[in-house]
Design a protein with these regions (language model features):
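Single-stranded nucleic acid-binding surfaces, predominantly the OB-fold ssDNA-binding core
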Residues: 1-209
Length: 209
């Protein structure tokens, strides 16, 4: 996965522990948002790039997405730092740095799908899914929802609430064609299996032609 562009938004309060919120767009058209570049805590060296965290009802904490390797995390961190440096130099609060120009996004390759299926009852959420993209980015908290009107199965990406109080925004976003590939992968897995042991692939998606 190559980083195509990075956007940073600096807080007006320069004393904040948050240096910037950040989002990254990759060459497969996937955009991850709601990351925070934090000032180092006491005893730490260097700024910290934090991916969003979800607190579940059971008391556990989960990341809607996270890099699959220290190397990819470092690449993400470096891109955010470079973009912030240019924003500071330009004296602007909202800044986007373009790393590569992409005429057409390529299709991502999905692998290591993990699906947990819930009992078939009145609750609309029927399963939760995690999947790895291009071997470098793990996407979590993807829900399979059974809609009633009209009757359909929906593959819903995780959301967070904006501070402005507007409708929830997605933690990561897809282009239309890759989302269709993800939808097919997830729904095929949902109807094939009841539950999959941790870290066991259900299906490796081939790159669509």
């Amino acid at each position: 996965m190559k980083i195509v562009e990075c956007r940073v938004i600096r807080p007006k309060d320069r004393s904040s522990v948050v240096l910037a919120t950040a989002e990254l767009l990759f060459d497969n058209g996937i955009r991850v948002v709601n990351m925070h570049l934090l000032k180092p805590r006491e005893g730490q060296e260097g700024n910290q790039l934090r991916t969003p965290v979800v607190h579940t009802k059971s008391g556990t904490t989960l990341n809607p997405f996270n890099p699959s390797s220290p190397e990819f995390r470092a690449a993400m961190h470096k891109a955010v730092e470079e973009t912030l440096a240019e924003a500071v130099e330009a004296q602007v609060n909202d800044y986007t740095k373009v790393f590569e120009t992409v005429e057409e996004f390529r299709m991502p390759v999905f692998s290591r799908l993990k699906l947990h299926k819930f009992p078939d009852n009145h609750i609309p959420v029927k399963a939760m899914v995690s999947v790895t993209v291009d071997g470098e980015l793990r996407l979590n908290r993807i829900a399979v929802i059974k809609a009633v009107d009209p009757p359909a199965y929906v593959v819903q990406l995780p959301t967070y609430t904006l501070q402005s109080g507007r409708r929830p925004a997605r933690d990561f976003r897809f282009q239309a064609e890759p989302y269709e590939a993800l939808y097919k992968l997830v729904t095929d897995a949902y109807f094939k299996v009841a539950e999959v042991a941790e870290d066991v692939p259900v299906q490796d998606a081939e790159e669509p032609a």
